[in-house]
Amino acid sequence: MVQGNNSFRELPINSQFRLENSPQGNNQRFLRFPLNGKVNGLLPLADLRGVIQVALTEILPVPQVAEFLLGIMNWRGEAIWILDLACLLGATHWCRREGVRNSGMAMLVQVQNQTVGLLVEQVNTIEVYDPQERLAISASMLPARLGSFLQGYFVDSQGSPLMLLDTHVVIQALQPL
């Protein structure tokens, strides 16, 4: 007979993962991550293959590609592109930011059998939203470059906007490769 392990009782339970926050009806789950110091983004969990920590030394730079492409790395025997998501969206390149970190979190997305790592400084929580509550982005809200990579936005309980990333458009940015 296998003995039960009581150590799980000592772990704090994060309210983000309680059953009451599980998807109901048309609700969908999204991974929340910071786009910059003021704005957070959301990535649909349905598009996510995984999240891994990536040291910059694991990324092999590729010459003569777009600036937002940091290079390729090996993930489970597969060569995948790692791109600087903030740079793609118009922010300062990872290596030129103040307080640059030697590692980040890559959100692995797959569209049409192509896996790409979207490098961000950190990932936060899994959140649940009703797609019917998604708001459209007006042309005056954001620069056109940023807006083209977004499906819209949600508003969190504190009234802050959460930008919904369109992973299909992000992957299309790689199509010339």
Feature map (PLM): residue ranges:
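An acidic, low-aromatic, low-complexity terminal/linker signal
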Residues: 1-177
